[in-house]
């Protein structure tokens, strides 16, 4: 009986851990990893870690319990077979982008679904999410589009000032 209680406590602790990660993450991506070699899995984990993405494998039944408790019933249908979970805490698109890029090179990895800010997305929607650039890239593009007209305006003012100086001489 003591072993049964201990196992139950361990499972409850895992469910609590999964719930905490699901609540804390900006995005969560589920992927099927069946058939990946150890080397491929190691490379994938390294890429995800470098981007600040946590990559885990849990028992599907435990993830199901955690998801249902949080109201993410929509992901339960994707929890069949070997499923890995990538938790993105900083950049909401990073898990989908990295897993999708990896899946293009390694056909054994397949995106299944994602949760972004409480909304569940299917495989196709997750692939579309992967196409969105990172926040830093979007900010750089925005700043570039703001800076360009200002630079042109400054150049124009400089040219006018130079022309006035030439005509004054």
UniProtKB/Swiss-Prot annotation:
Keywords, sorted A to Z: Ribonucleoprotein, Ribosomal protein, RNA-binding, rRNA-binding
Species for this entry: Clostridium perfringens (strain 13 / Type A)
GO cellular component, one term: ribosome
Gene of this entry: rplJ
Family: Belongs to the universal ribosomal protein uL10 family.
CDD domains: Ribosomal_L10 (cd05797)
UniProt GO BP: translation
Biological role stated in the UniProt entry: Forms part of the ribosomal stalk, playing a central role in the interaction of the ribosome with GTP-bound translation factors.
Superkingdom: Bacteria
InterPro entries from the UniProt entry: Ribosomal_uL10, Ribosomal_uL10-like_sf, Ribosomal_uL10_bac, Ribosomal_uL10_bac_type
Protein name in UniProt: Large ribosomal subunit protein uL10
SUPFAM superfamilies: Ribosomal protein L10-like
Record flagged with keyword Ribosomal protein: yes
Molecular function in Gene Ontology: large ribosomal subunit rRNA binding
Record note on quaternary structure: Part of the ribosomal stalk of the 50S ribosomal subunit. The N-terminus interacts with L11 and the large rRNA to form the base of the stalk. The C-terminus forms an elongated spine to which L12 dimers bind in a sequential fashion forming a multimeric L10(L12)X complex.
